[in-house]
Each structure stands twice: as structure tokens, then as C-alpha cells.
A protein has these predicted regions:
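Acidic metal-phosphate-binding loop of nucleotide-sugar-dependent transferases
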Residues: 43, 73, 98-100
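Active-site beta-to-alpha loop of glycosyltransferases that engages the nucleotide-sugar donor
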Residues: 7-21, 42-45
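Acidic donor-binding segment of Leloir-type glycosyltransferases
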Residues: 23-67
Length: 240
């Protein structure tokens, strides 16, 4: 298996159908073995129809697998479960809400294949989402650059798709179950001296769908960043 990409489908329901169909059409242009992993994990007791819809997609589209498990965490848990399920030499992740252009997968994959990078991701140069989302992203990236050395050249921590070599992912000890997982991937690359590259993209609006990013997100991000710093410093002291 050359390439696997996990699609985060949480509570997308019918809205995931055109995204997956378009992504599948683009992936079909690849002349090697590939797969899509539809991550449709769900909270027990919810009426979320996403797992059922993803299973229907997998029945009619080849090279599509579905991961539908009772959730034990938030977005980060889904991302880790999806990446763990990927079988390719190169693995990646993208949100299934349609805000990130699926064509960016081609650009990222071509770059990581042609050059000696361990991770290739995107950064958003033109955003069509809300002022609220843009403000949160700006503040978060600024805090990230202030708190973590070596991150200054990175423009956009949370942007996707993220595509990496399988052996690079195997070295990462990701723990976060929520929105901090994107940051953990970047921090792992910095800590492990892995080579990263960013490609510019246009970021689309959510349309009528409500964002899952709450106003408290910045405080949660800051809390996680400080906790990560504390753990890192504690491990250094123990090593010495």
C-alpha cells in the first residue's frame, strides 16, 4: 500500500457524501495502491447517522474503509485512530467538512514523494470562513510561536491535509484526544528534527454547517500548550 488518508467525518451525515465522492474521483487518478479511511466514530446513545452513511459509501466505492467506533475522546482521538488504521507507506489526514480543498492532497503528496520531507502540510493564505474562526486561528498560531522554539517558520499549525511518512508517524508519541493533536504532530516533528514543508491553499466556508470550535477554544489551546511545555521540561530534568 503506497498511500492512505484518513477523513474525519464526525457528525457530517449526508454532507460527507459529495466530499468523499469528489475525493475518491481525485484519488482514482493515482496509479498506485491507495485507500480512504472514513473515520465515523460516534458517541454512544447519539442519533448520529454518519457511520451508516459512510458504510453505504464504502459499499459502492472501492478502496474505501470505514472506522466507526464508540468515541473515547474528541477530535484528536478520532485523528489518532484514523492514522493508526492507515496502512500506506505515506499516511495523511484531512477534515471531511469540505473547507480544505481535496486537490491539496495531490500537491502535498507530490511534494513529499519528490523531496526529502517527513511531513508536508498546508497553510491557509485566503480564508472564506468567519471572522470568529480567523481570529481564533491568528491568536492560536501567535501563542504557539511565542511558546515553542523552532516553530517560527510554520505559518498555520492546524491546517490540513497533513501527509507524512509512516516511519515518521511511528516515532511520534501522540497523547491528545482533542484539538491539540495537530499541534502535537508539529511539536513531535520539531523535537525529532523531522523535515516539514507547507503549501499554500484557499480555505472555504462551512456553508450552513455550524462550527465545532467553541469560544473557549483559545483557553483550552493555551492550557494544552502550557501542559506540553511542563511535560517536556519534566522529561528533560529526569533524563539529566
Amino acid at each position: 500500500m503506497e498511500f492512505s488518508i484518513a477523513v474525519l467525518c464526525y457528525r457530517a451525515e449526508e454532507e460527507i457524501i459529495p466530499f468523499v465522492e469528489n475525493l475518491h474521483k481525485i484519488m482514482s487518478l493515482f496509479r498506485f495502491e491507495w485507500e480512504l479511511i472514513l473515520v465515523a466514530n460516534f458517541w454512544q446513545g447519539s442519533n448520529d447517522r454518519t457511520p451508516e452513511i459512510c458504510q453505504q459509501l464504502a459499499k459502492r466505492l472501492p478502496y474505501v474503509r470505514v472506522l466507526a467506533e464508540p468515541k473515547q475522546g474528541a477530535m484528536g482521538w478520532d485523528m489518532r485512530r484514523g492514522l493508526d488504521a492507515c496502512r500506506g507507506k505515506y499516511i495523511g489526514v484531512i477534515d471531511g467538512d469540505g473547507q480544505f480543498p481535496v486537490e491539496a492532497i495531490f500537491s502535498c503528496f507530490a511534494k513529499i514523494k519528490s523531496d526529502d520531507f517527513d511531513l508536508v502540510k498546508t497553510y491557509r493564505v485566503q480564508r472564506r470562513d468567519s471572522l470568529y474562526r480567523r481570529l481564533i486561528s491568528t491568536v492560536y498560531n501567535w501563542l504557539f510561536h511565542v511558546l515553542f522554539r523552532g516553530s517560527g517558520k510554520l505559518r498555520d499549525v492546524n491546517s490540513k491535509p497533513k501527509i507524512m511518512r509512516r516511519e515518521a508517524y511511528a516515532k511520534m508519541m501522540l497523547q491528545s484526544d482533542d484539538w491539540f493533536t495537530d499541534a502535537e504532530i508539529i511539536l513531535s516533528c520539531i523535537k525529532l528534527n523531522l523535515r516539514m514543508y507547507e503549501i499554500p491553499i484557499e480555505f472555504h466556508s462551512l456553508g450552513g454547517r455550524k462550527s465545532f470550535v467553541k469560544p473557549s477554544a483559545i483557553l483550552q489551546f493555551l492550557k494544552h500548550m502550557l501542559e506540553y511545555q511542563f511535560r517536556s521540561r519534566s522529561s528533560v530534568r529526569k533524563a539529566n
